[in-house]
């Protein structure tokens, strides 16, 4: 069996990892072994936080809707219940944007729900 030196292939692989870790602190962007470990850890964090972000944004939307509904003497849960009862299908992201950016429309929605 012939000997394979892997010069070009190994250099290309190491360069790819080092380019991915550009901007990392200390030797994590210079030395291949620590850069490789940092890169794997960064990818794990990215995977985890893509899922975490969805949870945190939903929490933020619910908090904003709750704050807006409590200004009109109603809790978040009763507001959502009355929305479902009135067959109004709006997601929490949209409701939160209405509560923050367009309070008049939110109040109209609120008064419509009260009538039902």
From Swiss-Prot:
Higher taxonomy: Eukaryota, Viridiplantae, Chlorophyta, Ulvophyceae, Oltmannsiellopsidales
Annotated keywords: Chloroplast, Plastid, Ribonucleoprotein, Ribosomal protein, RNA-binding, rRNA-binding
Subcellular location: Plastid, Chloroplast
Domain of life: Eukaryota
Full protein name: Large ribosomal subunit protein bL20c
Gene Ontology molecular function, alphabetical: rRNA binding; structural constituent of ribosome
Family (UniProt): Belongs to the bacterial ribosomal protein bL20 family.
Database matches in InterPro entries: Ribosomal_bL20, RIBOSOMAL_L20_CS, Ribosomal_protein_bL20_C
One GO BP annotation of this record: ribosomal large subunit assembly
Any one GO cellular component localisation term in the record: ribonucleoprotein complex
HAMAP family associated with the record: Ribosomal_bL20 (MF_00382)
Function: Binds directly to 23S ribosomal RNA and is necessary for the in vitro assembly process of the 50S ribosomal subunit. It is not involved in the protein synthesizing functions of that subunit.
The keyword Chloroplast appears for this protein: yes
Organism field: Oltmannsiellopsis viridis (Marine flagellate)
């Amino acid at each position: 069996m012939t000997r394979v030196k892997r010069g070009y292939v190994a250099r290309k692989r190491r360069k790819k990892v080092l380019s991915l870790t550009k901007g990392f602190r200390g030797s994590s962007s210079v030395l291949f072994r620590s850069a490789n470990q940092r890169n794997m850890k960064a990818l794990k964090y990215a995977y985890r936080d893509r899922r975490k972000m969805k949870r945190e944004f939903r929490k933020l939307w619910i908090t904003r809707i709750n704050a807006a509904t409590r200004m009109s003497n109603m809790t978040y849960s009763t507001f959502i219940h009355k929305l479902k009862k009135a067959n109004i299908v709006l997601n929490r992201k949209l409701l939160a944007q209405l509560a923050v950016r367009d309070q008049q429309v939110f109040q109209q929605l609120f008064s419509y729900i009260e009538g039902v």
